[in-house]
From Swiss-Prot:
The protein's name: UDP-N-acetylmuramoyl-L-alanyl-D-glutamate--2,6-diaminopimelate ligase
Classification lineage: Bacteria, Pseudomonadati, Chlamydiota, Chlamydiia, Chlamydiales
A GO BP annotation: regulation of cell shape
Role summary: Catalyzes the addition of meso-diaminopimelic acid to the nucleotide precursor UDP-N-acetylmuramoyl-L-alanyl-D-glutamate (UMAG) in the biosynthesis of bacterial cell-wall peptidoglycan.
GO cellular component, one term: cytoplasm
C-alpha cells in the first residue's frame, strides 16, 4: 500500500506533500526504522518518541505520526491528539483489516487469561479450526512463535500478527486482552466475535486510578462485541450482570456456585487433576482435567463454552480433548522429582496467590506444610504488597524474596511486603536463587513448595540490568545437586 492510499480519508491533520511512495512498515521503534517506514512517535512513561523522530527520518522514514507537529522534520507528518487511535487506524488499514477475516476471541479478567486462551486455542485446533494465539507467554502465528513481552501488543504489532495469521490460513485468533490494552486503545479496529470474562479482582492500580476505572476498561471489550457475537461470562462474579448488560452480544454463562449455562458440580480434586460433572441443558457429562484447583474449573468451563457455542463442536469431543490438555508453562506447573511436590506459578496478584495456595493446601497431608517463595514487582501497584503477605500467612510458611524489582530497591519492596505479616512465620532471602534453594532445603516429603510470581518468565529485571532467570531451571538445578 502506498502513502496516499493509506492516508486517504484519515481524520488526522497532514503536513507535507503526500506522494504515492510505497509504505514498507509501521513501527514505534526508531532503531528498527528502514527506508519506506512510518514512524509512530509515541510519548511513553520513560521516553518520548518525538525525541527520536530525526533519527527515524535519517534511517529512511517517509512519514512520522505524532501528537505534536515538528516544523523541522523534512517528511510528511500525520498529527492527531489521539495518537493511539491513529496508530490503530493506520495499522488496521495497512494490514487489510485482518481481524475481519478471522474469528477473534478476546479473553479479559484479572487472572486466568493465559490458561483460558491456551485451552481455547487447543480446542479450536481439535475441531479443525486452527487458531493463532496472542498472549503473555508467547504469540503463535501459525508456524512462527514470538515472545515480545506484551500480553496485548501495541496496535502496529497486533495488526501485523493478525495479518500473519490470515496469511497462515488460520481460522481464528485467540487473544489475551489486558485492561491497559483496552484503556489505551490498542484494540481499536479489532473486530471481536467473542468476549470472555474470567474474573475481576484488584490489579494494575499503578495504572488505573481506581478499581472502578479498572472495571470500566474491562467492560470496554464487551461493548465492542457485535449483536452476532458471544459474551461468555463467569456467572459467579458479583459483577457478572454488569458485563452482560454492557453488551449487545448473546450472553453465555458458566460457573460453579450460581446457575449457569455451563455449570460444574460434584467436584473432586487430586494432586494429578480434577474430576467434575458438567451440566448443560439438563444433561450431565463426566469431565476430567489434568489441571488442579477450583480456579482451573472455571478456566475449563470458559474454554468449553466458547468452543461449543462458537463452533458447535460435539460436547463429548471437547471433553475428551480437555482430558489430555495440561497447563501452560508456569501455571501451576508441577515438578515431582524433588523431596516433595514443587509447583511453579505466575501468581502475582493477591487473588491469584490465594487461589493457588488454597489449591495446594488442600493437597497437603495432615502434618504437611505449604512453603511459598514469593516477592512483588517493582514500579507496580504497591498497595498489594502487604496483602500478598497476608494471603501467604493464611496458608503456610513464606520465603520472601525478590521478584522483578525494576527501578526500586529490592530491600524496600521486601520490607513493605513483610509489614503485612502478623506472625513471624516467614524468612527473608533477597537473592531469589538462594530463596528457592533455602525453601527446598527445609522441605520434607510431607510438604509442598510453591515458587510464585514469575511463572514462565526467563529473566529478572533490575534497575540497571536484566539477567537470565528461570524459576523452573533454578529448581531443577538445585534438585540435581541433591543427587
Amino acid at each position: 500500500m502506498n502513502l496516499k492510499e493509506l492516508l486517504h480519508n484519515t481524520k488526522a491533520k497532514i503536513y507535507g506533500k503526500i506522494s504515492s511512495v510505497e509504505v514498507r512498515n509501521l513501527t514505534r521503534d526508531s532503531r528498527n526504522v528502514g527506508v519506506g517506514d512510518i514512524f509512530i512517535a509515541k510519548q511513553g512513561k520513560h521516553c518520548d518518541g518525538n525525541d527520536f523522530s530525526h533519527l527515524a527520518v535519517e534511517n529512511g522514514a517517509i512519514a512520522v505520526a505524532s501528537s505534536i507537529y515538528n516544523p523541522f522534520l523534512p517528511v510528511v507528518q500525520i498529527i492527531s491528539s489521539d495518537l493511539p487511535r491513529l496508530e490503530a487506524d493506520l495499522a488496521a488499514k495497512y494490514y487489510g483489516h485482518p481481524s475481519q477475516k478471522l474469528c477473534v476471541v478476546g479473553i479479559t479478567g484479572t487472572n486466568g487469561k493465559t490458561t483460558v486462551s491456551h485451552l481455547i486455542k487447543l480446542l479450536f485446533d481439535a475441531c479443525d479450526k486452527p487458531a493463532g494465539l496472542i498472549g503473555t507467554i508467547e504469540h503463535i502465528l501459525g508456524n512462527s512463535r514470538i515472545q515480545d513481552g506484551y500480553t496485548t501488543p501495541e496496535s502496529c504489532l497486533l495488526q501485523k500478527y493478525l495479518a500473519k495469521m490470515v496469511k497462515s490460513h488460520l481460522s481464528a485468533a485467540v487473544m489475551e486482552v489486558s485492561s491497559i490494552g483496552l484503556a489505551v486503545n490498542r484494540l481499536a479496529n479489532v473486530d471481536f466475535d467473542v468476549g470472555v470474562l474470567t474474573n475481576l479482582t484488584l490489579d494494575h492500580l499503578d495504572f488505573h486510578s481506581s478499581f472502578e476505572e479498572y472495571k470500566q476498561a474491562k467492560l470496554k471489550l464487551f461493548s465492542m462485541l457485535p449483536s452476532s457475537g458471544l459474551a461468555v461470562v463467569n456467572n459467579d462474579l458479583c459483577d457478572a450482570a454488569q458485563f452482560i448488560e454492557a453488551t449487545q452480544a448473546q450472553p453465555i454463562t458458566y460457573g460453579i456456585e450460581q446457575h449457569a449455562d455451563y455449570q460444574a458440580s460434584h467436584v473432586r480434586f487430586s494432586p494429578f487433576g480434577t474430576d467434575f460433572d458438567l451440566l448443560y441443558k439438563g444433561e450431565t457429562f463426566a469431565c476430567y482435567s489434568p489441571l488442579i484447583g477450583q480456579h482451573n474449573i472455571y478456566n475449563v468451563l470458559a474454554a468449553i463454552a466458547v468452543t461449543h457455542q462458537r463452533l458447535r463442536c460435539d460436547l463429548p469431543h471437547l471433553i475428551s480433548v480437555i482430558a489430555n490438555v495440561g497447563a501452560p508453562r508456569g501455571r501451576l506447573e508441577p515438578i515431582f522429582s524433588g523431596p516433595c511436590p514443587i509447583y511453579i506459578d505466575y501468581a502475582h496478584t493477591p487473588d491469584a496467590l490465594d487461589n493457588v495456595c488454597q489449591t495446594l493446601q488442600a493437597l497437603l497431608p495432615q502434618d504437611g506444610r505449604l512453603i511459598v517463595v514469593f516477592g512483588c514487582g517493582g514500579d507496580r501497584d504497591q498497595s498489594k504488597r502487604k496483602i500478598m503477605a497476608q494471603v501467604v500467612e493464611k496458608y503456610g510458611f513464606a520465603v520472601v524474596t525478590t521478584d522483578n524489582p525494576r527501578g526500586e530497591d529490592p530491600e524496600k519492596i521486601i520490607n513493605e511486603i513483610c509489614s503485612g505479616f502478623l506472625k513471624r512465620n516467614f524468612s527473608i532471602e533477597i537473592d531469589r536463587k538462594q530463596a528457592i534453594t533455602y525453601a527446598l532445603s527445609i522441605a520434607s516429603d510431607r510438604d509442598i513448595v510453591l515458587v510464585a510470581g514469575k511463572g514462565h518468565e526467563t529473566y529478572q529485571i533490575f534497575k540497571h540490568q536484566t539477567i537470565a532467570f528461570d524459576d523452573k531451571e533454578i529448581v531443577l538445578g538445585v534438585l540435581s545437586s541433591y543427587v
